[in-house]
């Protein structure tokens, strides 16, 4: 099972997302269930190694946000067109 540490995003929008990517992080969102969608930021280097394994897409993942564990599945992964970089991930609550 994969466990990912995340932080709640303070800023949203194109400029904020670009600043995150320049800082070796990237935006993501957790949605689904009865709770409101949660915009988060993830560390790129940690997640890029995890997503190289097929289990990342098929198993339930645990994301820790502010000490609270959220069970999710990866729904959509957006990659850079030619660089080996992740741009954004959508997670759906499990």
From Swiss-Prot:
Kindly state which keywords UniProt assigns to this record, in alphabetical order: Ribonucleoprotein, Ribosomal protein, RNA-binding, rRNA-binding
Top-level taxonomic group? Bacteria
Q: By its UniProt entry, which CDD domains does this protein fall under? A: Ribosomal_L25_TL5_CTC
What's any GO biological process attached to this entry?
A: translation
Query: What GO MF annotations does this protein's record show?
Result: 5S rRNA binding; structural constituent of ribosome
Query: SUPFAM superfamilies, alphabetically?
Result: Ribosomal protein L25-like
- General function of this protein: This is one of the proteins that binds to the 5S RNA in the ribosome where it forms part of the central protuberance.
Assembly state and interactors?
Part of the 50S ribosomal subunit; part of the 5S rRNA/L5/L18/L25 subcomplex. Contacts the 5S rRNA. Binds to the 5S rRNA independently of L5 and L18.
> Hey, which family's this protein in?
Belongs to the bacterial ribosomal protein bL25 family.
Put simply, this protein is called Large ribosomal subunit protein bL25
């Amino acid at each position: 099972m994969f466990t990912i540490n995340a932080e709640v995003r303070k800023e949203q929008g194109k400029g904020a997302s670009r600043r995150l990517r320049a800082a070796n992080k990237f935006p993501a969102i957790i949605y689904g269930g009865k709770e409101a969608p949660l915009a988060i930021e993830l560390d790129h280097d940690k997640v890029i190694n995890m997503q190289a394994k097929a289990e990342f897409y098929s198993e339930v993942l645990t994301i820790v946000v502010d000490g609270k564990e959220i069970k999710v599945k990866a729904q959509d992964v957006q990659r850079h067109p030619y660089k080996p970089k992740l741009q954004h991930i959508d997670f759906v609550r499990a």
